[in-house]
Amino acid sequence: MKNETIRKLVLSAMFAALCCVATMIVQIPTVAGYTNLGECMCLLAGLVLGPWYGFFAAGIGSGLADLLAGYAHYVPGTFLIKGLVALIAALLLRPLLKKGEKIPFWRLAVIELPSEVVMVLGYFGYKALILGKGLSAAASIPNNLVQAAIGIVLSVLLYTALSKVP
């Protein structure tokens, strides 16, 4: 294995663990489940690792958190949704990285918005269609919007700080 591949695998495992821990440690219970800081780590995984490594790190870490927290019925949806959050953020960031320009805070936040729209709609669809909760799944939308906003702000702050490290 090349050193770069080993580095990516180690970082992916670290981000999976960070996604899991950030989801489980800071849990704010709500009627629709819980709000957590895992969203920040999912976005950051995509931005740092790129689309596919980020997809698997975010999906596995977040899915593991759901499993360990007793929400096993959410694991398949969480794996896909959180993986897509990282994948979309990474794909939208890629063209800006190729230009080599400094990316301002607001632009990073805008890049992450589509990922969070997928998260909010993804969980609504999963709860409504797969788990059979119908329109009552809409009750989780405000909670997910708050989680998305917190995730965007924190991940942009962390990414900006990390991008200054050589």
What are these regions (language model features)?
Residues 1-166:
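Loop-helix junctions at membrane interfaces
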